Amino acid sequence: MISIIIQILLISVSVAMDAFAVSIGKGLTVSRVRVQDAVKSTLWFGGFQMLFPILGYFAASTFSKYVTQFDHWIIFALLVFIGGNMVHEAFEEDEENSKETAQFDWKHMLPLAVACSIDAFAVGVSLAFMFTKAHMAFAILSIGVVTGLFSAAGLHIGRAFGSRWQKPAQIAGGVVLILLGIKVLLEHLGVIAF
């Protein structure tokens, strides 16, 4: 049980890194972080990070009887792809984001929340094969809460420290997802046991 909780928390932190990085970027452009802006950021990112794994879970559940014999390969491929993409994106410079002023209305937050949650959809697919329904509910709640907290913290960190933490956070999140994907594959192949 402790192992499952640790896995869920690691997944939650990893999935939250995109929203954290975007929030740091938004924090760079504000003179001060208003409470209502932190709440909006928390609700947008946390809410979408909860919604997309649910959608991924239901998509996977619908087709699970067809893919259970190779689900570990799906989990491995998705987590390694998502993690690798996060690491790759960390090394790409996005000059548009650095020049954009932080706005928190729905026209600005909706595309960011969706973009940051695409990975969470794929993680939801993976979670459908990894956990029971009860564990899945805890995972979805954990992903939403952790993402919300990280996005609020990202605003403050971006405001206080600048862009120094944006790239390392995204790289760390990507590496953790890659390692989790490798762990799932090695467990299924009987190389390791947890």
Swiss-Prot record:
Subcellular location: Cell membrane
InterPro entries: Mntp/YtaF, Put_MntP
GO molecular function, one term: manganese ion transmembrane transporter activity
Topology of the protein relative to the lipid bilayer: Multi-pass membrane protein
Entry keyword set: Cell membrane, Ion transport, Manganese, Membrane, Transmembrane, Transmembrane helix, Transport
Major subcellular location class: membrane
Residue ranges the record marks as coiled coil: none
Chain ranges passing through the membrane: 2-22, 43-63, 67-87, 111-131, 137-157, 174-194
Gene Ontology cellular component annotations, sorted alphabetically: plasma membrane
Function: Probably functions as a manganese efflux pump.
Family assignment from sequence similarity: Belongs to the MntP (TC 9.B.29) family.
Protein name: Putative manganese efflux pump MntP
